[in-house]
Amino acid sequence: MYRIGIDLGGTNTAAGLVDDSLKIIDKISVPTVLPTDPDSLTDGMAMLVRQLLSRNQLSAKEIHCIGVGVPCTANEENGCMEDAAHLGFESGAFLEPLRKKTGIPVFFGNDANAAALGEYSTGGYDQDSLIMVTLGTGIGGGIILNGKLWSGINYAAAEFGHMTIRNDGVPCICGRRGCFETYGSGYALIRRTRECMETDRDSLLWQLCGGNPDKVEAKTLFDGAKAGDTAALQILDGYTTDLADGLANIINIFQPAVLCIGGGISKAGDILLQPLRKKTALRICTKNAKRNTQIILARADNDAGIIGAALLGN
């Protein structure tokens, strides 16, 4: 039997046909059109499912289930997507409409939770606890305890991006101030970079973005830091300090064996990881213990979200 995993992202929606060994046999990725509504969303996903079945000469009866990772709260009790402002609506029915449109059992979960499950299942871990923090447009997360995904009583656990790290800090889309993602997300890093560039017209960052701040990406900052640009190094220092504050909070609460950094920002590699490890180590309560949480970059590739989504039906 096969499974289909769908990773609904803010930029792209990817659907993959997954076999019993968790290998992706075929994959389709299309741009995510936002804002949207629940009916249009399930129509698009049903179309992706039909395309995968057709391309691989399979029938719906040969698919064990469809699993979907969504960037909002996935209420398993009523089958609705909730708190879905990023998608253009507040809430809406999801599981039953998609099941009717495909004829296949459907399961869903938060996208970062699904990525954590995919990472844990394919990354070769021998520990029974792992926390994943995804650094992308925002900050998400997933919690693996005793080898199982933990999503909380309201299916909204691991919203690490919305813990406060600065009182009266930068306003967040959630309505609060000083949330972790307003300082540690990819969007926050780009904001910091643009602000710093305006005060340092000689920075290499101007050259790296072609003189247009609107073209600044996270990669712009990391490339500047690797080249030794003073402004870029200052931005990176402040960014990793704020990241370390948030990660230390998570470690102090959960004490996981592994804390895994995923998402687009993690692709920066050691220039991000090394200062992050050092600064976090200074902030945790057990800094003198013989055994502490390993902070690593995600081992699985960008397909972890698809594989994790496919496993939501377990």
Where are the model-predicted features located?
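ATP-binding/phosphotransfer module of carbohydrate and carboxylate kinases, centering on a glycine-rich
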Residues: M1-C65, N75-N78, L95-I104, S121-Q127, ...
